[in-house]
Amino acid sequence: MLVPLSLLQKFFSSPLSIEEILQACDRIGIEAECSNVFPDSLNTVVTGKILSASPHPDAERLTVAIVFDGKGERQIICGAPNCRAGIIVPIALPGAKLRNASGEITTIKKAKIRGLESQGMCCGADELGFPHLQKAERGIFEFPADTPLGESACMLLAGAPLECSLTPNLGHCASLLGLAREISFLSPVSLNIPEEFSFASLPQETSICDMHDAGACPVFYSVKISGLSCRRSPEYLQAALTALGQKPLNAIVDITNYVMLSLGQPLHAYDSQAVEQKSLHAATLQSAQPLTLLNQETYTLPAGSLVVADQHNILGLAGVMGSAASSCSENTTEIILEAAYFQPQAVRKYQRTIQLHTEAAYRFTRGVDPQGVLPVLHAAIHMIQSLFPDAQISPIQKIGDDSFSPLSLSVRPKTIKRLLDIELSTAEIVAKLSSLGFQTAVEEQAVRVEVPSYRHDIQEETDLVEEICRTTPFVQKTQKILPTYTPIYSLKRELTAFLANGGLQQFFTYSLLDTEVSSLSLQESSLIPVQNSSWKLRDSLLPGMLKSAATNLHRQAPYVYAFEIGNVYSKEQNRYQEEERVAILLSRQVMDDSWQGKTPLSFYTIKGWVEKLLCQSGASIEDFSLQPSQHPNFHPYQQAALYQKKHLLGIFGTLHPQLCRKAQIKHDVVFAELSLNVLLSLKKKSGPHYVPYPIYPASSRDITITIDRDLPADLVRRELLSFESKWLESVHIVSVYQGRDSASQSKNVSLRMVFRDHERTLSGQEIEEEYERLTALLDKKLANIGQGNS
């Protein structure tokens, strides 16, 4: 965004130096730099006002001028014919170096001219390197009467010395008014609205239109203005638009562009001859339709696009560009001027679809001030009246509701302390936020804040903390060394090192999946599509890893042992969620050529890796339970879900053969995917717990129990461990047997119970009694949840 200093200064109660403006932009978060660089010698060319001008006593063509340069008066002998009292001109102070028409450099010095001392030189624009601004063949350049004195003349003549880059959250700064308002909050000046934007309220009428889309366009204003002509704009308006980076077209269009760039609210003028019944409204297309816009390009507007229309015709793409058929031409004498508030999400949707970027779309997609629509319309009408005194203005037509309910948020001192490590009282919070234009009220241990209508970037308490941060000098902020790593980052480093040391290679795959990769999932409908493209956001690490594994195997890799840590995305209750996960994928056995023969990968291979991962994460395996799973990407009988109480940690198992065939992998593939956030929440804060090695022997007893085939074998083990016993040290599953008869509804589970006392050796009788007690409790427990027989 180009920002002419001469125009920006009009919005301040008193002028600011370039350094002050740049410092304020830096605190706002705007990257600003001078787009024109001048030699240091030209910095001594400043603006000065001629207080008096009298003829030189010894020369007819010379004038003795007394000039005030912002600091003091000085006498300058000038030969320009337009040298007169009251004008503001460029003054080259002694030491300035100017280049003449032949290219030679002249150093300005104090000198006597016909017996009188001259302490500088009054310059023309061509002598400073701006010949295109010189209006007369001979003469000094004249600045507007409101130009501040003592400022760099070259910076003012350059037109756009500042080039500002706005981040998406600073849409309210995309105008001279918005930028000046933010600078005034952080500078010793107040905001000043120039007289050219002053206005008197005009009559207003409310209209009802059944076709108007009030959801996408809460309020829509239009006004008919007649008695106009599309002549060229005055020179000052053309110069201002050029400095702002816009090409002047005609008086009507130039006014709408100038008001938009100055005040931030886009406007559009329609030739009333193209508008049926002289009435406009905003409507949503029910089906795709073609439309030729002002750039003479024809676009197919998708269904759902918001358009500006009359009773039968589309006259413009709302918030982006008007149609060619309704544009103002040299024959236009009557216009309908439109100003509206279009919802950012509505404009953003179709603007990206047709890939058309305009100044209006830039502002609407970031959010304009809903309470500034009518004042800006009044300002534009005022400027039109100043250029066309005989213009007739009809009453303003309003469709929709212009009422506004400000967002109310609370900010607490403890939140500021937690995020910024700064102690602030409620009174200090009120002072800081009030200085930024927020309405505040003190509550119990908090400050209630009303967000201004133009601040679309303020949505929650942390946004207010950011505002407080930028008003706090660095010297007041605590200087402390931040933690080296966040807990989640530390966990990722630990898991990466562990898995890499275990022989696994790390994969890095894209979060966006194309059509080919996204098809490597039997649950494709759950992927989140990216608007206007065939790409989709992944909801699992599986598709990308499976594609990479297939690529490696097709290139004769003997095996694939890989892992990946990355983000996945999902949509729950109309809200998008982002989660970090760790995944392991194994295909083919590393030791296929061993003398022991081939040992194929199985469900238990990946189960072992999951258990290792849990141990490495610092979580206790006993805190988890395995439950049946029916995920379509896995083999229906070789998968399991891992739960911690009611929280799903992840799913693992053998991939579905159909999915392996889609990936053109001939071997079995086992896969596991776990949530890092759940792992982190279960990590033991105290670290590993060490116990002394037992000095007394342990004794074991085996038990085989028949249970329902649908009951998990691990359920029996957990039930045994849940019984209170001072001697039962551990329980392991030895085997699970199910007969070949498909009609059998039971299976045998063999377990080994280990008993030990850490203070003495247990007798055989004590072990037998404890064993009998536990098996009796187990039979009773299993009777309630399924058939059990030990």
Swiss-Prot record:
Annotated S-S bridges: none
EC supergroup of this enzyme: ligase
EC number: 6.1.1.20
Predominant localisation class: cytoplasm
UniProt-listed GO biological process terms: phenylalanyl-tRNA aminoacylation
Stretches that traverse the bilayer: none
Pfam family, one: FDX-ACB
GO terms under cellular component: phenylalanine-tRNA ligase complex
GO molecular function: ATP binding; magnesium ion binding; phenylalanine-tRNA ligase activity; tRNA binding
Superkingdom of the source species: Bacteria
Keywords: Aminoacyl-tRNA synthetase, ATP-binding, Cytoplasm, Ligase, Magnesium, Metal-binding, Nucleotide-binding, Protein biosynthesis, RNA-binding, tRNA-binding
Cofactor note: Binds 2 magnesium ions per tetramer.
Names of required cofactors: Mg(2+)
Catalytic reaction equation(s): tRNA(Phe) + L-phenylalanine + ATP = L-phenylalanyl-tRNA(Phe) + AMP + diphosphate + H(+)
Residue ranges constituting the tRNA-binding domain according to the UniProt record: 39-154
Binding-site list for Mg(2+): 457, 463, 466-467
The B5 domain, residue ranges: 404-483
Cross-referenced SUPFAM superfamilies: Anticodon-binding domain of PheRS (SSF54991), Class II aaRS and biotin synthetases (SSF55681), Nucleic acid-binding proteins (SSF50249), PheT/TilS domain (SSF56037), Putative DNA-binding domain (SSF46955)
Domain named FDX-ACB: residues: 694-790
PANTHER family assigned: PHENYLALANINE--TRNA LIGASE BETA SUBUNIT (PTHR10947:SF0), PHENYLALANYL-TRNA SYNTHETASE BETA CHAIN AND LEUCINE-RICH REPEAT-CONTAINING PROTEIN 47 (PTHR10947)
Family membership noted in the UniProt record: Belongs to the phenylalanyl-tRNA synthetase beta subunit family. Type 1 subfamily.
NCBIfam families linked to this entry: pheT_bact
Quaternary structure note: Tetramer of two alpha and two beta subunits.
Name of the protein this chain belongs to: Phenylalanine--tRNA ligase beta subunit
Species this chain originates from: Chlamydia trachomatis serovar D (strain ATCC VR-885 / DSM 19411 / UW-3/Cx)
Gene of this entry: pheT
